[in-house]
Amino acid sequence: MGESLDRCIDDINRAVDSMSTLYFKPPGIFHNAILQGASNKASIRKDITRLIKDCNHDEAYLLFKVNPEKQSVSRRDGKEGVFDYVIKRDTDMKRNRRLGRPGEKPIIHVPKEVYLNKDRLDLNNKRRRTATTSGGGLNGFIFDTDLIGSSVISNSSSGTFKALSAVFKDDPQIQRLLYALENGSVLMEEESNNQRRKTIFVEDFPTDLILKVMAEVTDLWPLTEFKQDYDQLYHNYEQLSSKLRFIKKEVLLQDDRLKTMSQYHPSSSHDVAKIIRKEKDEIRRLEMEIANLQE
């Protein structure tokens, strides 16, 4: 028994010595750049972990759906990726071989979705230029004429925007925001003059509308990462809003003090003028701080 144990220990020691002599390639440039050269290593590691991790059962059920007939898994928002294309290509190749048809050429194909997206972007740009020159529009928007009587989000939009558009179908402001999120901006007619239009970007919309859309995203796709990001952004928004309200109250208080002083001191002495200048400087400083917070 003792000899058998000594023999096992001896084998383990020889294996350890053998492994210690092996050469293992050091980490490459990409590994070093990601994990060692990043200023915020914790955030980078979190992103990489989120990218490669497997979904739990609840998250997978909310993001994907199973086709019992084809025994395939697809995204609930309808978007297809490389995996879906590879499965479809393999199915077509097997069917062609079974039917005796020649293989498709070239072997490497560009998914049809790439061409459709490019054509859609070109068509949208063309229609946008045409609408800008001709003055056409609908409900303050410049978008495809096929959308008359329907929502702002077109049929060629991704499933994410379609789902959000269905939730906020009765809110025109959020419909405009969704259109701007998908296309970068939206052209709107000014109320004072219907012949004039202005370009509205995403950052021009009220913050509470953007947070409302984000809250709905966390409800439709309740991933842990989405919820954490939303909670952090909402907390920052509440802090800035509270500080902004406090500064506005300070401005009103300073203004009331100036008015009171002007009523009780009609003769502008040197001291009163100095105090008034000081109060006005304080008001200007607070107004600049308000402008910085709003930006």
Curated annotation (Swiss-Prot):
InterPro entries: Spc34 (IPR013966). Its main location: nucleus. The modification Phosphothreonine is found at T199. GO terms for biological process: attachment of spindle microtubules to kinetochore; cell division; mitotic sister chromatid biorientation; positive regulation of attachment of spindle microtubules to kinetochore; positive regulation of microtubule polymerization; protein transport along microtubule to mitotic spindle pole body. It is found in: Nucleus; Cytoplasm, Cytoskeleton, Spindle; Chromosome, Centromere, Kinetochore; Chromosome. The keyword Plastid does not apply. GO terms for cellular component: cytoplasm; DASH complex; mitotic spindle; spindle microtubule. The keyword Nucleotide-binding does not apply. Residues 223-295 form a coiled coil. Keywords: Cell cycle, Cell division, Centromere, Chromosome, Chromosome partition, Coiled coil, Cytoplasm, Cytoskeleton, Kinetochore, Microtubule, Mitosis, Nucleus, Phosphoprotein. Component of the DASH complex that connects microtubules with kinetochores and couples microtubule depolymerisation to chromosome movement; it is involved in retrieving kinetochores to the spindle poles before their re-orientation on the spindle in early mitosis and allows microtubule depolymerization to pull chromosomes apart and resist detachment during anaphase. Belongs to the DASH complex SPC34 family. Component of the DASH complex consisting of ASK1, DAD1, DAD2, DAD3, DAD4, DAM1, DUO1, HSK3, SPC19 and SPC34, with a stoichiometry of one copy of each subunit per complex. Multiple DASH complexes oligomerize to form a ring that encircles spindle microtubules and organizes the rod-like NDC80 complexes of the outer kinetochore. DASH complex oligomerization strengthens microtubule attachments. On cytoplasmic microtubules, DASH complexes appear to form patches instead of rings. This is DASH complex subunit SPC34. It comes from Saccharomyces cerevisiae (strain ATCC 204508 / S288c) (Baker's yeast). The gene is SPC34.
